[in-house]
Structures are given as structure tokens and as C-alpha cells.
Amino acid sequence: MNLKILWMYHDLMDLYGDKGNAEVLRRRAEKRGIEVQLDTCTIGEEKNIDEYDLFFLGGGADKEQNLIFADLLQRKQSIQTAMDHKTAFLLICGGYQLFGQYYKDQDGNVIEGLKFFDYYTVAGNRDERCIGNIAVETTMDGKTFKAVGFENHGGQTKNVSTPF
């Protein structure tokens, strides 16, 4: 079995060490006998997103989100095609925000999103970040899974009505 991962904007959207997340994905798959191809893509590079099994987009500060947005917008139809063909997406932090309607920072500035989903994110109080281990249970395709991870965010995502 093979797994093709496309890590988008690896050079810009790596705020909290998403390189480690990509490497963990690779190693866990390889331990299960899955051959992994991990490719990167940044602004201006051509990749056929639909050829990948997993689209990975990490976190980035407001500056980096603004930098990549025009490039992401040019890829919107390709991303939609990949979604329609059941490509999996792992979106972290700013990557997640960019797939919603918008992100509003603490000064009221808005970074537009790709609008794939109904949600939007608003920056929270700088002194009230959500930081720590997290475990959630979810059901997908009739199977129940426990997802375990670490959260570190200050934004509040609202209007989550579109099923992922």
C-alpha cells in the first residue's frame, strides 16, 4: 500500500513545528507497512493536488496566511476537485482558518478564507489561549475513533454547520 502526502507551504506555514507532524504521519504509516511519498509545494510551484491521498497544511501567523492566500485562491478549483475525489485534508491552525469564511484578528483585520466551509474564526483574548492535551471521540463512516492531540490556539471558531 502507498500513501502520497502533499505538504503545502512547508516553508511558510510551520509555526508550531508542523514538520514534526508531517514526519509523525510518515513514520506511523511506515510502521504499518505503508510506503510513503511526502512531497512539498510552495507559492508558484505546480502540483496536481488530486494525485495525492493527503493534503497537509500547517499553521502560520497572520503575515504568512496573507502571503499564501493569493496562491491558495488560484488553487481553489484543484482543491475542490481533490475534495470531491475524497482526498483527505489535515488542516492545522492558520491552514484550517483559511478553508473557512474568514479569520478576524484582535485588531479587527480580516483575512479572507477560501469559503469551503461555513465556519469563521475570531481571535480571542491574548491572555486566554487554549493550551494542552486533548482527546475527542468522533464517528466517521460508521466507525468510532478517538483522536488524541495537543491544542495551542487563541482563536474561537464559530458557525460550524458544514460537516467535515
Label every PLM stretch briefly.
Residues 1-81:
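N-terminal beta1-alpha1 cap of cysteine-dependent amidohydrolase-like domains
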Residues 2, 124-164:
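Amide-donor transfer/coupling interface in amidating biosynthetic enzymes
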Residues 6-18, 46-49, 103-111, 144-153:
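Short low-complexity stretches enriched in small and charged residues
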Residues 9-10, 41-43, 58-60, 92-95, ...:
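Fold-independent oxyanion-binding glycine-rich loops
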Residues 25-34, 102-107, 159-164:
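Short charge-dense sequence patches
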Residues 30-34, 84, 119-122, 157:
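Generic secondary-structure signature for well-ordered alpha-helical cores
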Residues 62-137, 144:
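Cysteine-nucleophile active-site neighborhood
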